[in-house]
Swiss-Prot record:
It comes from the Eukaryota. This is Myosin-D. Its main location: membrane. ATP binds at residues 189-196. One of its GO terms (molecular function) is actin filament binding.
Length: 822
């Protein structure tokens, strides 16, 4: 389900970065355009976020008087503060710019307006170097056919072609084979943004050989498994009804001439806590609803299925998802399992485990005093029956599982000591068993797929990697899941920042410019705040989860104490509140720690893993294959947070060995209709996908770069005396144009073929150019009048008056420009 419009508006508004004196007002102060959040149109439709206004006389750098001109003209005069104003890019044709970074201003409203106008012209790809931004068109634009593939595959210089996902494919393939280095194309975005379609397009390009042949074997195998992976790994969240709750990394063996020869799928960071609890407006994984709604009578009986409302692990407040027909999807999942060469026994085991995981939630322990332990866990009545049936469905020995859920075993040296688990302890063990069985079943399905598509030995010398992963998440209620997802994105952001500046250094080196002029900051301090040893958010959570008396309240209190004075962390002003704020790369995110400790405790004891390995079922025996067990120890490594960090570390180790390319997918509206653009919806994603951050990183050094010829042509009107100097080459003109301004030498650099400018220098040149052109405005009306006279061929003596005026004005302007006149 899409997020409520008012929620998007509030979230987007909170993310907007304040304007500034520099961006808000120019010293000329003459009738120029700006964006503001205070326009009448925004008051009427908050989704707009910004409206375009004209600055009126009487404005100062602190306070501006405005009049709205877009989306509709309004005579109302506004008085706003500079922090509520952002400069616009008047006169810019968005179709002539392939790279957002080439715009004079790249503030939030300018980027939104630029992308919106391109999108409404059906131009969905844009560069925000080194990113490619892809906006979901919700229609077939016929831009991915054989002709388009051939255009990008065969072009002598692909850099001269418009932005496209095929550009990323071509560049990655070329680098892979020429440099013999693995490549990764990272595709990110929220559900519905077009990640799946983008990945399919990338695979289509990679599978097409230079001779026009299409090798569909591996692509078909992977796509056939996609409904199964989505059923087990996707769920309805408050923002999206088909949200991928895991990261997917595909390794592809691509021939030099094109064609996918082998492949492998690796799953990262499955959101296990969702299996046992969901927020009010969210669902569990799709597979549960497909099975319970779509299974025929004989399956319902065989797998002991009950109504949805009967299961504790199913949120009763959200049983359906708009746009999803669970019964139809169940049929598709069944067909996909068959296409994956599953045996009948394997398929039956899958359904049995799915049912058993759900039923395990109904096995609720109750307390009694036993062996000197108050509230000792035991299972009686319906709970005992549920546990017995769940074990049967999971192919686990019931007496053994019952023992592990009620009897606590510890070791003192070689001595074995038994006592009783309390009810809360038993509930955590039961939940961990359910989560572990489901997660390992999901991974087993992927291993089964890989057995059919990966090369012999399972290793790749050089590969093309496709990473499909979620971006930053900012909800109205942000829990442990959002914290883990946002930590993942911060780590990816650090990698991204390193790559951006590595490319900057390469360009500077090529152009002969000192890299000492690059100044930038990283999110290293933030990552240390989130993940550092001893004093960090994750460390504090792990400490509380290990402690017998640990609670969410103590966790939040510990954070406030340990991170006091840390600029990346803001405690709640209410000491009784479970909320805390982290200052992420994308802005401030408020987390609610209610349930953090419970969600993080994934204490699947070694004894329980050993029970699965003693199962009579072949599939169940192999579920925990490769999982190390060590009896008698309960450590941080068993917690979800630790497992998450292990997987994240593994993902980054793979990515860092490759050369990365980035595609950011944008969902322009929740209605999935063509040409509809919702600013509030898009702005959240621009932050979440680090698109604005990419532009910000470029602003930190010489963000503007043009060839000498392009620079001389763009800013020729600043000083016509220099621009029209006879015999001067482009570089000489550039140097003299810059010297004729007040721009200091440390604000620009001259390379071998290009001019590099810092952001404020580029903005000053734009202003000087506009002032120069504005000074010529009196001549416009005169020339228009002369044109009319000429066309009418009126040869009266009255014509001499406008001619005289023209000559006088032209002579005056030429003298001002330093051009000698007779």
């Amino acid at each position: 389900m899409a997020a409520k419009p008012e929620q998007d508006c509030k979230t987007a508004a909170a993310l907007i970065r304040a304007g500034s004196l520099i961006e808000g007002v120019e010293s000329a102060g003459k009738d120029f355009l700006v964006w503001t959040t205070q326009g009448p149109a925004v008051k009427k439709d908050p989704d707009l976020l910004f409206s375009l206004c004209r600055v009126l006389p009487g404005s100062t750098q602190q306070t501006l008087k405005l009049q709205q001109v877009e989306p509709t003209a309004d005579s109302q005069e506004l008085t706003v503060q500079a922090k509520e104003v952002w400069q616009a890019n008047p006169g810019i044709d968005p179709l002539t710019y392939g790279d957002i970074g080439g715009l004079p201003h790249t503030n939030e409203p300018c980027v939104l307006d630029f992308l919106a106008r391109r999108y409404q012209s059906k131009v969905i790809y844009t560069t925000a170097e080194p990113l490619i931004v892809a906006v979901n068109p919700f229609q077939d634009l016929k831009n991915a056919g054989p002709d388009t593939i051939a255009l990008y595959r065969d072009a002598p210089d692909v850099d001269k072609l418009p932005p496209h996902v095929f550009y990323a494919s071509r560049r990655a393939m070329t680098n892979m084979h020429q440099l013999k280095k693995p490549q990764t194309i990272i595709v990110s975005g929220e559900s519905g943004a077009g990640k799946t379609e983008t990945t399919k397009m990338l695979m289509k390009y990679l599978a097409t050989s230079a001779g026009g042949n299409l090798d569909l074997k591996i692509q078909t195998a992977i796509m056939a498994a996609n409904p199964v992976l989505e059923a087990f790994g996707n769920a309805k969240t408050v923002r999206n009804n088909n949200s991928s709750r895991f990261g997917r990394f595909m390794l592809l063996d691509v021939a030099r001439e094109g064609g996918i020869q082998h492949g492998k799928v690796v799953a990262f960071l499955l959101e296990k806590s969702r299996i046992v609890c969901q927020d009010k407006d969210e669902r569990n994984y799709h597979i549960f609803y497909q099975f319970l709604k779509g299974a025929p009578g004989h399956m319902r009986q065989r797998y002991m299925l009950q109504p949805l409302e009967a299961y504790t692990f199913i949120n009763p407040h959200c049983l359906d998802a708009p746009g999803i027909v669970d019964t139809e999807d169940f049929e598709q999942t069944v067909k996909s399992l068959e296409s994956m060469n599953m045996t009948e026994t394997e398929t039956c085991t899958i359904w049995s485990i799915v049912s058993g995981v759900l039923l395990m939630g109904n096995a609720k322990p109750t307390g009694k005093t036993e062996a000197g332990v108050e509230n000792a866990a035991c299972f009686v009545g319906e709970s005992e029956a549920a546990l017995r049936n769940a074990c049967s469905l999971l192919f686990l020995d019931y007496p053994s599982i019952l023992h592990e859920l009620t009897v606590k075993t510890t070791y003192a040296g070689s001595n074995k000591i038994e006592s009783r688990w309390t009810v809360p302890d038993s509930e955590m063990l039961r939940a961990s068993l359910a989560k572990g069985m489901f997660e390992q079943l999901f991974l087993w399905i992927i291993r089964k797929l890989n057995a059919d598509i990966e090369p012999k030995g399972g290793s790749f010398d050089v590969f093309m990697g496709l990473l499909d992963i979620f971006g930053f998440e900012v909800f109205q209620n942000n829990s442990l899941e959002q914290l883990f997802i946002n930590i993942t994105n911060e780590v990816l952001q650090r990698n991204f920042t390193d790559i951006v500046f590595e490319k900057e250094l390469q360009l500077y080196s090529k152009e002969g410019i000192s890299s000492k002029k690059i100044e930038y900051t990283t999110n290293e301090k933030l990552i240390e705040t989130l993940l550092g040893k001893g004093t960090s958010v994750l460390a504090a959570l792990e400490d509380q989860c290990i402690s017998p008396s640990g609670t969410d309240e103590k966790f939040v209190s510990s954070l406030a104490s340990k991170l006091a004075g840390n600029k990346c962390f803001i405690p709640s002003k209410n000491t009784k509140s479970l909320e805390f704020t982290v200052v992420h790369t994308i802005g401030k995110v408020i987390y609610n720690a209610d349930g953090f400790a419970f969600k993080n405790k994934d204490v699947l004891r070694p004894e329980i893993i050993e029970i699965t390995r003693a199962s009579t079922n072949d599939v169940v025996r192999g579920l925990f294959e490769g999982v190390k067990v060590e009896k008698g120890k309960m450590a941080k490594g068993m917690l979800i947070g630790s497992q998450f960090m292990t997987q994240l570390k593994g993902l980054m180790e793979v990515i860092q060995k490759t050369e990365s390319h980035f595609i950011r997918c944008i969902k322009p509206n929740d209605d999935k209709v063509p040409l509809k653009w919702v600013n509030s919806k898009v702005l959240i994603q621009l932050h979440a996908l680090s698109i604005l951050e990419a532009l910000h990183l470029r602003q930190l050094a010489f963000s503007y770069r043009r060839t000498f010829e392009e620079f001389a042509a763009q800013f020729r009107f600043i000083n016509l005396g220099v621009s029209n100097k006879p015999g001067a080459d482009a570089k000489t003109i550039c140097v003299e144009l810059l010297k004729s301004t007040s721009i200091s030498a440390d604000e620009y650099a001259l390379g071998k073929t290009m001019v590099f400018l810092k952001p404020q220098a580029a903005k000053m040149l734009v202003r000087l150019q506009r002032e120069a052109l504005s000074a010529w405005e009196p001549l416009v009306g005169v020339f228009e009048g002369m044109t009319v006279l000429k066309r009418a061929k009126q040869l009266s003596t009255g014509r001499a008056v406008p001619a005289t005026r023209i000559c006088a004005n032209v002579r005056r302007k030429l003298v001002q420009a330093g051009i000698k006149v007779c």
